[in-house]
C-alpha cells in the first residue's frame, strides 16, 4: 500500500533528500480517490501530495480559460521536473469524454482520473449573495523557509489573516480559498520551491477578476503572504483598473506592514534590523502560533549577514530605496533572512491580531473608495459627464 505524505509540510533539506523518482502529485481540488491514484502510479512505496489547486477549472465554481490555467499549472509542474523529479504530475478530473481537462507542456505531466468526491458542478465561487462585499484573494506560496520551517509558511500565514479578516467583518468581506502557489525568481537556489511564472501569474489573477466582474463583483483585495508575488500583483491591479474602470481593485505590501502592524512589530520584536525578512522572527512566530507541530526550532539558524548598503538592506518594513534581485545564495546559507531564534508563539498571536485589524481597516477603505468614486461618476464629475463607461 502506498504511503501518501504532504509535500508542503517538508523543509527544503527534506525535499532535497527525496528520491527523484518519488511521484509528486498536484491535484486540482480535493476529494480524489487516492487508492485509484496509487494504482495508476503502479503502487509506489511513497507518493507526495502537493497542496490542492483551489479553483480555475470547470466544476470548481470559478472557471478560467483553459490556456490561462494550463500555463499556471504547467509552470508549477515544470519547476519540479527541472529539479529532477521525473514523476511530477498534475491530477485532473477526467471528463465524460475520457479526455484530460487541459493540455500541459507535455502530455506526460498529467494524470486524469474520473471524478470521485470532486463536485462536477460546484456552486458559484464566491456565492452570488456576496456581491457588494470586498472579495479577499489570499495568495501564499510553496517555497523553502530555512532549515526549521515547512514550505507552506506563506500559505498558512496569509490564509489565517484573510479568514480572520472575513470573520472580523463578515458583512463587509468574503475570502476566497487560499492559493498556495505564487512566483519565486530565486527558485533554483534551494530545493522544494515552485514558481507559477510572473506572466502566467498575472494572467491568472487578471482572469479571476474578469470572471468576477462579469458576475457583478466590483471590490477586490489581492492579499499576499509571499514577497515574490508583490510586484506582479501591482501589475494585476494596474491592468484590472485599466480594463474595468468602475471597480476598485487593490493590493498591499504583504501584511503586518502598515501603521498598526509596524507599531506591533516595534513593540514586541527582540531582533535588530535585519532580523525580520524570511523564515525570520516574524514568520517563525506566526507559525509557532498557527502550526507549532511543523516548526523545528532546534534546526533554526539566524541569518543576518545580508550585504547591506545605505539604500539596499533587508528587514520586513525597511529595505532602502533601491530595488534589486541578486541571488539569494549571496546572503544566506540556509535559505533564511533574519533571526528565527527570537520567535515565540505569543508574538505570533499578537502579530496575527494586528495583521487582521490592519486588513479589516483596508476593507473599510476599499468600500469607502468605491462608494465615493461611484458617487462622483454618477454625478458626471469631469470627463465622466461625457464618458460613463
Question: What do these predicted regions represent?
Answer:
Residues 1-221, 227-389:
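Extended, histidine- and acidic-residue-enriched regions that form the cofactor-binding/catalytic faces
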Amino acid at each position: 500500500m502506498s504511503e501518501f505524505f504532504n509535500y508542503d509540510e517538508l523543509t527544503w533539506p527534506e525535499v532535497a533528500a527525496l528520491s527523484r523518482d518519488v511521484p509528486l502529485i498536484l491535484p486540482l481540488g480535493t476529494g480524489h480517490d487516492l487508492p485509484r491514484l496509487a494504482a495508476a502510479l503502479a503502487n509506489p512505496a511513497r507518493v507526495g501530495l502537493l497542496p490542492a489547486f483551489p479553483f480555475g477549472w470547470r466544476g470548481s465554481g470559478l472557471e478560467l480559460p483553459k490556456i490561462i490555467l494550463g500555463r499556471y499549472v504547467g509552470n508549477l509542474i515544470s519547476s519540479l521536473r527541472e529539479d529532477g523529479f521525473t514523476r511530477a504530475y498534475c491530477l485532473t478530473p477526467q471528463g465524460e469524454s475520457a479526455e484530460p481537462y487541459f493540455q500541459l507542456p507535455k502530455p506526460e505531466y498529467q494524470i486524469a482520473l474520473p471524478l470521485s468526491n470532486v463536485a462536477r458542478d460546484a456552486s458559484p465561487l464566491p456565492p452570488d449573495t456576496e456581491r457588494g462585499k470586498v472579495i479577499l484573494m489570499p495568495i501564499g506560496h510553496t517555497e523553502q523557509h530555512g532549515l526549521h520551517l515547512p514550505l507552506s509558511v506563506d500559505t498558512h500565514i496569509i490564509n489565517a489573516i484573510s479568514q480572520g479578516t472575513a470573520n472580523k467583518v463578515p458583512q463587509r468581506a468574503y475570502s476566497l480559498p487560499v492559493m498556495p502557489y505564487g512566483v519565486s525568481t530565486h527558485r533554483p537556489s534551494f530545493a522544494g520551491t515552485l514558481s507559477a511564472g510572473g506572466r502566467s501569474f498575472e494572467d491568472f489573477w487578471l482572469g479571476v477578476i474578469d470572471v468576477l466582474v462579469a458576475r457583478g463583483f466590483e471590490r477586490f483585495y489581492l492579499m499576499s503572504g509571499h514577497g515574490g508575488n508583490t510586484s506582479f500583483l501591482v501589475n494585476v491591479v494596474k491592468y484590472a483598473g485599466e480594463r474595468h474602470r468602475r471597480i476598485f481593485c487593490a493590493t498591499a505590501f504583504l501584511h503586518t506592514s502598515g501603521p498598526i502592524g509596524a507599531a506591533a512589530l516595534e513593540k514586541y520584536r527582540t531582533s535588530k534590523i535585519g532580523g525580520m525578512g524570511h523564515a525570520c522572527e516574524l514568520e517563525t512566530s506566526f507559525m509557532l502560533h498557527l502550526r507549532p507541530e511543523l516548526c523545528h526550532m532546534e534546526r533554526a539558524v539566524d541569518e543576518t549577514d545580508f550585504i547591506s548598503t545605505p539604500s539596499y538592506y533587508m528587514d520586513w518594513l525597511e529595505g532602502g530605496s533601491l530595488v534589486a534581485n541578486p541571488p539569494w545564495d549571496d546572503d544566506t546559507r540556509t535559505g533564511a533572512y533574519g533571526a528565527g531564534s527570537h520567535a515565540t508563539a505569543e508574538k505570533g498571536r499578537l502579530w496575527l491580531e494586528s495583521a487582521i485589524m490592519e486588513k479589516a481597516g483596508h476593507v473599510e477603505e476599499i468600500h469607502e473608495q468605491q462608494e465615493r468614486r461611484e458617487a462622483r461618476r454618477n454625478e458626471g464629475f469631469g470627463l465622466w459627464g461625457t464618458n460613463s463607461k
